[in-house]
Amino acid sequence: MIIRSPEPEVKILVDRDPIKTSFEEWAKPGHFSRTIAKGPDTTTWIWNLHADAHDFDSHTNDLEEISRKVFSAHFGQLSIIFLWLSGMYFHGARFSNYEAWLSDPTHIRPSAQVVWPIVGQEILNGDVGGGFRGIQITSGFFQIWRASGITSELQLYCTAIGALVFAALMLFAGWFHYHKAAPKLAWFQDVESMLNHHLTGLLGLGSLSWAGHQIHVSLPINQFLNAAVDPKEIPLPHEFILNRDLLAQLYPSFAEGATPFFTLNWSKYAEFLTFRGGLDPVTGGLWLTDIIHHHLAIAILFLIAGHMYRTNWGIGHSIKDILEAHKGPFTGQGHKGLYEILTTSWHAQLSINLAMLGSLTIVVAHHMYSMPPYPYLATDYGTQLSLFTHHMWIGGFLIVGAAAHAAIFMVRDYDPTIRYNDLLDRVLRHRDAIISHLNWVCIFLGFHSFGLYIHNDTMSALGRPQDMFSDTAIQLQPVFAQWIQNTHALAPGTTAPGATTSTSLTWGGDNLVAVGGKVALLPIPLGTADFLVHHIHAFTIHVTVLILLKGVLFARSSRLIPDKANLGFRFPCDGPGRGGTCQVSAWDHVFLGLFWMYNSISVVIFHFSWKMQSDVWGSISDQGIVNHITGGNFAQSSITINGWLRDFLWAQASQVIQSYGSSLSAYGLFFLGAHFVWAFSLMFLFSGRGYWQELIESIVWAHNKLKVAPATQPRALSIVQGRAVGVTHYLLGGIATTWAFFLARIIAVG
């Protein structure tokens, strides 16, 4: 007789038809809230409608219902992303010079937009080479398309249509998984299964299939393109996939198929799985064979990782066990209870994910120029500058978002009665020590970093260059950074014996890669100027962290307002009759943190823009002499505040200021308009609610006099609304100004 263990019951993890599809309900503004659904009495109604439409916590207390709404909304988000991608590919197919660029990427610049000749706007269509007139784009799409093996505009059309189909599919999925088959709460909380599927499916199989595409499609097509074969002569992607002999002509080991893999004779594959380091001298991008090797390795890593967590089979890790075992000598209960927090508070979960994704986005920004992954990306200076700037801004916003949702978690989801002596509780109990020390660090960094600049400005003004902090007088060399650079430059042959070149040319050595007479990358020297500005980076980042962390740690209570948790996430002040309690809500800390995030990122992208123009980007003569765009002036000019104002902001703004009448004139108009949007924000930030209410009353009086008064009573923005409108215009105005300044400059000189 065979004794079997009882089969685990199959759990039903969805509810069928939980909520009926009702267009009547959707057509009613504010249907999710009893108050808002009544319709407007005052103009505040429209603001509340927008503020609460996606605040699912305010619609219901049922965690399952909230989870379903979030899940469904994610499909909507994916649909929008597919729609956007489809638009990008369609522009590439319909309005671009992609095929011309592909045939001569060093002389022809990418363009995927042609302006219609309405009221003289055709001036914006600049000559991008090859007889094509259009707007130069700096998104990097052309470079990605070439790297992935797209050789014709027809292929772009097909991809665009495919993305539209996926967009429709995602919209359907969002409706289906809310109205037809909605997952139960247990499904959202099954973290081990989720980890296994996401790690194996998204990251493991995703990387494996990408590596497969790169080997079978991208690699042969890029080989032909690098050898200057006409794109129309190159076999189509499916021919490489279906006909192994085609690949074997380029890479003989292909003839052996999978035999070397199963006989462990893996070195046979070294033709297309390499570990070279450095850049391909033809394209100025990473070696495609290195990239393939990377994706294959990542795939194997995540396929293993995706089998590590305990589900129905009773083997593997349990996240709860791991967290509860995580105790140290000074950490009390450690992570006990964290599992319950992360499976019942999506704000806590989102906060951690935003912090990690934001940091990762900033890491991406730094790798895009130091290890440019796509062909002809490194010599497209406009795209390099745009990608760095874009990823820095996105990373900054995501990190502020992490603090915002951490604070919302503290206010709405944290239960202090059941949390005792775990890590979070211990951090909260010594929050005064944390914040006061962090405050001291900010003061120290601020005075010292700024003080070094002020010293230099003073000495410069007094005509005493020998007393300045500079590479030629009193040196403050970034010795630790230089040591790290040197270690990496020496790594090939020592710590990485298989590699021929270091991971990035920026580390040092004497390697320089130039493509078509333009510098792709070279070793980046660091000196006193970098030491100074890096301490400004440290200062601005620490102040941002101080504001955001104070908002999180004091979200529920403080000495000033012990019952802050009862007032909610956002409130203007602690009620009438208690002065000095405004701007203390967790929301206000996010509001203030956004300004410092803006400061931080601005200094970073200014540093990057000037440093690259001064020390990296430029042309190279036949004799091998490099002529940089700003002639290496960063080291001597950026060591004073005056230098930053005169030789960076003012000198490099000449292109955007003088752009009128040229194809760059749109940037001049944006520069002007975005300054205006930025200035408009100050109206909301510097004036109070009462001022506007008084003005409104008088305007309403005039309307009554003429018998044209509206039924909905006009109201001034609330304090929080005014601040929200203010910070939005401040950031968008500032970012758009910087964008216009950067692009007009780099397109003109790059």
Curated annotation (Swiss-Prot):
Which superkingdom heads the taxonomic lineage of this protein's source? Answer: Eukaryota
| Residues reported to bind phylloquinone | 692
The chemistry this enzyme catalyses reads: reduced [plastocyanin] + hnu + oxidized [2Fe-2S]-[ferredoxin] = oxidized [plastocyanin] + reduced [2Fe-2S]-[ferredoxin]
TM annotation in the entry = 70-93, 156-179, 195-219, 291-309, 346-369, 385-411, 433-455, 531-549, 589-610, 664-686, 724-744
Q: Name one GO molecular function term.
A: chlorophyll binding
What does the cofactor field's note say?
Answer: P700 is a chlorophyll a/chlorophyll a' dimer, A0 is one or more chlorophyll a, A1 is one or both phylloquinones and FX is a shared 4Fe-4S iron-sulfur center.
Q: Where in the cell is it found?
A: Plastid, Chloroplast thylakoid membrane
Where does this protein hold chlorophyll a? Answer: 683, 691
**Membrane topology of this protein:** Multi-pass membrane protein
> Listed GO cellular component terms?
chloroplast thylakoid membrane; photosystem I
First-tier enzyme category under EC: oxidoreductase
| Swiss-Prot/TrEMBL keywords | 4Fe-4S, Chlorophyll, Chloroplast, Chromophore, Electron transport, Iron, Iron-sulfur, Magnesium, Membrane, Metal-binding, Oxidoreductase, Photosynthesis, Photosystem I, Plastid, Thylakoid, Transmembrane, Transmembrane helix, Transport
- Major location (coarse): plastid
From the UniProt record, give one GO term of the biological process aspect: photosynthesis
Q: Which InterPro entries match?
A: PSI_PsaA, PSI_PsaA/B, PSI_PsaA/B_CS, PSI_PsaA/B_sf
Subunit structure comment from the entry: The PsaA/B heterodimer binds the P700 chlorophyll special pair and subsequent electron acceptors. PSI consists of a core antenna complex that captures photons, and an electron transfer chain that converts photonic excitation into a charge separation. The eukaryotic PSI reaction center is composed of at least 11 subunits.
What task does this protein carry out? PsaA and PsaB bind P700, the primary electron donor of photosystem I (PSI), as well as the electron acceptors A0, A1 and FX. PSI is a plastocyanin-ferredoxin oxidoreductase, converting photonic excitation into a charge separation, which transfers an electron from the donor P700 chlorophyll pair to the spectroscopically characterized acceptors A0, A1, FX, FA and FB in turn. Oxidized P700 is reduced on the lumenal side of the thylakoid membrane by plastocyanin.
Q: What's the name of the protein? A: Photosystem I P700 chlorophyll a apoprotein A1
Naturally occurring in which organism (per UniProt): Glycine max
